[in-house]
A protein has these predicted regions:
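Long hydrophobic segments that form regular secondary structure
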Residues: 112, 116-124, 130-136
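Short acidic/histidine-rich active-site segments
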Residues: 68-75, 128, 137-140, 145-171, ...
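Glycine-enriched alpha-helix->loop->beta-strand junction motifs that scaffold or abut catalytic
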Residues: 62-67, 99-102, 119-128, 149-154, ...
Length: 248
């Protein structure tokens, strides 16, 4: 597991300071134990619940030891709050505080503009799309095609909306085609996100190769109880994953 605790100003300064300390203590514990199955990030909620003062405290407590996990531009309220109260968009604000980097994960990134995508790209920051959660909350669709085209490391998550990653895969594909009004886009992008990029994201935190079957790699294997109704081969396995299988 790679874990963190969500820092927020929502419950007052005392709780916020406790959350910051919880992250710092857990990072220290992981550094001491060096358990290859356990890693730490520094968690934050969303920018509209985190003040500049709190960001400074988070960065000081982290001291460059690990990356950050934070919800970004999930809804337009995050963008409006950032512009109104801080005079800049969310991604710029994160960059100004030193939050971005190649071990930081930005959740959602639905309402990011071109300039923000460039910052994400140039800082090698990771993004994780949560298609079902975003649709369920009616807050928009992540610009997956544009992010993928820029070479941004883009993974797939759930935001705790489901525990079925193949369900998320289906929804990710359908949402991108619906959003772009094109019936032939998204296939390569969403399969890359789940089967390749998620492993690359994991490798940022665990000292073993993931997502491949080869000597020395992690035993990153699941067995599916699946009876295909049409021919099944290595040439059409993605189609069976999307249209035939479930994760349950």
């Amino acid at each position: 597991s790679c874990l963190c605790y969500e820092v927020s100003d929502r419950d007052g300064e005392e709780k916020c300071l406790q959350a910051i300390q919880e992250n710092a203590d857990f990072i220290t514990e992981c550094e001491k134990n060096k358990d290859p199955m356990l890693a730490a990030m520094f968690g934050g909620h969303a920018l509209f619940t985190i003040s500049d003062k709190t960001f400074d405290r988070m960065v000081e407590a982290n001291n460059g030891r690990t990356g950050y996990h934070i919800h970004v531009s999930e809804g337009m309220n995050d963008v409006y709050d950032s512009l109104q109260n801080y005079g800049r968009r969310p991604i710029q604000r994160l960059q100004d505080h030193g939050i971005l980097g190649d071990k930081t994960i930005l959740g959602h990134c639905i309402h990011v503009n071109t300039a923000e995508m460039e910052i994400i790209q140039h800082t090698n920051t990771m993004v994780v799309n949560n298609p079902e959660s975003n649709m369920g909350n009616a807050i928009g669709i992540c610009p997956v095609l544009q992010l993928h085209k820029r070479g941004i490391l883009l993974g797939m998550g759930t935001d705790a909306y489901t525990n079925d990653m193949l369900e998320s895969l289906k929804v990710a594909l359908c949402s991108q085609r619906s959003q772009n009004c094109l019936p032939n886009v998204g296939w390569c992008e969403v399969t890359d996100m789940l089967f390749r990029n998620n492993a690359k994201i994991g490798e940022k935190y665990f000292p073993v190769q993931l997502g491949v079957l080869k000597p020395g790699a992690a035993a990153d294997i699941i067995v599916m109880d699946y009876k295909p109704f049409t021919p099944f081969s290595d040439e059409n396995i993605d189609g069976h994953m999307i249209f035939g299988m479930t994760g349950r």
